[in-house]
């Protein structure tokens, strides 16, 4: 490992040990705070994922999207038939 990374990890470990040793009984330790932060980030990411999925599904099912897909399909078939007739 690079020295800077090693030093940073050592400092974080010392901070965790120092914080857990001096915290009051009712106050959450640094590890508990980090664990809670991790849970909050996970819930946030899950919510964003669900909302994004719902928005994309709604966009996919919209009238504009359906009409656009149909238009492209029809025109692609026409071009394909023209090319087939031209080069056959």
From Swiss-Prot:
One Pfam assignment: ApoC-I
Cellular localisation: Secreted
Secretion signal span: 1-23
MF terms in GO: fatty acid binding; phospholipase inhibitor activity
Keyword Lipid biosynthesis (UniProt): no
Coiled-coil portions: none
Entry-linked InterPro entries: ApoC-1_sf, ApoC-I
UniProt keyword annotations, A-Z: Lipid transport, Secreted, Signal, Transport, VLDL
Function according to Swiss-Prot or TrEMBL: Inhibitor of lipoprotein binding to the low density lipoprotein (LDL) receptor, LDL receptor-related protein, and very low density lipoprotein (VLDL) receptor. Associates with high density lipoproteins (HDL) and the triacylglycerol-rich lipoproteins in the plasma and makes up about 10% of the protein of the VLDL and 2% of that of HDL. Appears to interfere directly with fatty acid uptake and is also the major plasma inhibitor of cholesteryl ester transfer protein (CETP). Binds free fatty acids and reduces their intracellular esterification.
Family to which the UniProt record says this protein belongs: Belongs to the apolipoprotein C1 family.
Protein name, as recorded: Apolipoprotein C-I
Species of origin: Alligator mississippiensis
């Amino acid at each position: 490992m690079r020295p800077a990374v090693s030093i940073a990890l050592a400092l974080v470990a010392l901070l965790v040990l120092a914080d857990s040793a001096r915290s009051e009984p009712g106050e959450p330790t640094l590890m508990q705070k980090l664990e809670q932060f991790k849970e909050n980030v996970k819930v946030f990411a899950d919510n964003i994922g669900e909302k994004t999925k719902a928005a994309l599904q709604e966009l996919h099912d919209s009238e504009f999207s359906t009409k656009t897909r149909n238009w492209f399909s029809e025109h692609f078939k026409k071009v394909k038939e023209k090319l087939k007739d031209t080069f056959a």
